[in-house]
């Protein structure tokens, strides 16, 4: 009986310790490196962005556009005013 009580207290203590030790930490998925930040450019480049012969063009990533959230209707719900 004592062994069961001691193991349950130990498990609770370890659980609390693991929770509070990781609470303030943040794990970024893609940490940004200061020298590796790329600007975004439009998907269809204009004539001013076209590279000329012998000139290097700045490497950029395509811009991401935020899509509007699609509205969904709950069947049988009354319209809200």
UniProtKB/Swiss-Prot annotation:
One GO BP: angiogenesis
Bridged cysteine pairs (disulfide): 40-63, 41-60
Assigned keywords, A-Z: Antibiotic, Antimicrobial, Chemotaxis, Cytokine, Disulfide bond, Secreted, Signal
Pfam families for this protein: GPR15L
Listed GO MF terms: chemokine activity; G protein-coupled receptor binding; receptor ligand activity
Entry keyword annotation includes Acetylation: no
InterPro entries in alphabetical order: GPR15L
GO cellular component: extracellular space
Subcellular location: Secreted
Endpoints of the signal sequence: 1-24
Subunit structure: Interacts with SUSD2; the interaction is direct.
Role summary: Highly cationic protein that has multiple functions. Acts as a chemotactic factor that mediates lymphocytes recruitment to epithelia through binding and activation of the G-protein coupled receptor GPR15. May be a tumor suppressor; together with SUSD2 has a growth inhibitory effect on colon cancer cells which includes G1 cell cycle arrest. May regulate keratinocyte proliferation. In addition, through activation of Mas-related G protein-coupled receptors (MRGPRs) contributes to pruritogenesis by activating itch-selective sensory neurons and mast cells degranulation. Has antimicrobial activity against Gram-positive bacteria, including Staphylococcus aureus and Actinomyces spec., and Mycoplasma hominis and lentivirus.
Protein name: Protein GPR15LG
Species of the source: Sus scrofa
